């Protein structure tokens, strides 16, 4: 703990010494002496600690994972020199890995957005080599988080945001065929349920983030279409049509008739439409499926662009309407007037 706090010191020498110590501690000691990773994960998940200390723990933990977790990573440090002799050590012990993964999953529903974001980043790195064989609890836990919006759960907003932030990070990783199929089959329907839900709890930003996740899945599928032909065909044929139908409802041009640009939620609604247009651009590459919905969706997109012209003039030419700033947690689905 003291070393992590020292990394935040205003004194350069103190910071350098602390960072050097932590860098040394992430190097292999022995196959059994492996408590650093668990300790860092515990510090990250401890809500009573200073946010800066928790963030410092996250930075150190990510370095630890890269060097110690698995030979799967190119950065894995397998050999060390002790008294001039090169010794080979094992990766992080199984029990320690379980503790760390459990702590990181808990951090996904932390009240602090920055903790959720850093935990997601580390967990996606771990999942790229552990999921699904060594990380079977991942998808059930995420499903529980995504289902929480239907329950009277005080932490539902954190859970849903954390789960979707992780999914975004995960689908940016190069998933194999089995991983991609499992994510699509078990989580994409839940995301669609959130998007189409009539619940007042579901904010436009939450819906936009769901679309963003599936959008990234589509990008991964498109890039893998020549490698995983059957999987890509099955997933897109089964899951894409319901999403395209839902986009028609969400793109209703009536929104602009009553839009109040003094209300933050109005800008969130605009951000949702921006995310839909980006999604449709990728979905259009799957022509056999998209062509059925293309005429209606194209009319809706053109109608939206026409409706946005007055807003564009007010924001960018006359400067009569102030463009809102987004909080860090919502930067990934922030609105735009330029489309």
Regions found by a protein language model. Give the residues of each.
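Short inter-helical turns and helix N-cap capping residues of alpha-solenoid HEAT/ARM repeat scaffolds
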Residues: 10-11, 48-50, 111-112, 150-156, ...
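Acidic, Ser/Thr-rich intrinsically disordered and amphipathic helical segments
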Residues: 2, 17-20, 35, 39, ...
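Hydrophobic residues within the alpha-helices of tandem HEAT/HEAT-like
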Residues: 22-27, 57-68, 122-130, 163-174, ...
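N-terminal "cap/leader" segments of large eukaryotic alpha-helical scaffolds
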Residues: 1-48, 151
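Eukaryotic helix-linker segments that join adjacent hydrophobic helices
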Residues: 48-110, 114-117, 121
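Residue-level detector of extended alpha-helical repeat arrays and alpha-solenoid scaffolds
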Residues: 14-15, 54, 97, 116, ...
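Amphipathic alpha-helical segments within extended alpha-helical solenoids and repeat-rich scaffolds
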Residues: 27-43, 80-110, 132-153, 180-200, ...
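Extended repeat-based solenoid scaffolds, especially LRR ectodomains
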Residues: 331-339
């Amino acid at each position: 703990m003291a070393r992590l706090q020292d990394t935040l010191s205003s004194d350069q020498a103190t910071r350098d010494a602390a960072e050097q110590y932590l860098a040394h501690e992430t190097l292999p000691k022995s196959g059994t002496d492996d408590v650093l990773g668990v300790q860092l994960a515990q510090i990250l998940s401890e809500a009573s600690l200073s946010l800066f200390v928790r963030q410092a723990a996250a930075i150190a933990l990510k370095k630890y994972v890269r060097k110690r977790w698995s030979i799967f990573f190119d950065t894995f440090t397998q050999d060390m020199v002790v008294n001039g002799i090169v010794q080979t050590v094992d990766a992080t012990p199984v029990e320690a890995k379980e503790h760390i993964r459990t702590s990181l999953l808990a951090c996904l529903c932390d009240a602090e957005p920055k903790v959720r974001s850093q935990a997601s980043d580390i967990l996606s790195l771990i999942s790229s080599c552990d999921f699904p064989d060594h990380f079977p609890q991942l998808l059930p836990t995420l499903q529980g988080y995504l289902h929480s919006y239907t329950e009277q759960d005080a932490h539902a907003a954190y859970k849903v945001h954390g789960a979707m932030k992780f999914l975004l990070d995960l689908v940016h990783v190069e998933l194999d065929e089995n991983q991609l199929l499992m994510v699509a089959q078990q989580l994409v329907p839940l995301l669609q349920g959130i998007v189409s839900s009539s619940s007042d709890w579901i904010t436009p930003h939450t819906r936009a983030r769901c679309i963003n996740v599936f959008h990234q899945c589509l990008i991964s599928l498109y890039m893998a279409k020549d490698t995983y032909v059957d999987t890509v065909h099955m997933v897109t044929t089964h899951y894409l049509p319901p999403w395209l139908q839902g986009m028609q409802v969400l793109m209703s041009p009536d929104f602009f008739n009553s839009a109040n640009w003094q209300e933050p939620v109005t800008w969130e609604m605009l951000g949702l439409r921006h995310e839909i247009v980006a999604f449709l651009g990728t979905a259009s590459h799957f022509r056999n499926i998209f062509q059925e919905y293309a005429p209606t969706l194209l009319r809706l997109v053109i109608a939206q662009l026409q409706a946005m012209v007055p807003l564009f003039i007010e924001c960018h030419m006359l400067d009569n309407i102030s463009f809102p700033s987004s909080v860090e947690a919502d930067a990934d689905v922030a609105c735009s007037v330029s489309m």
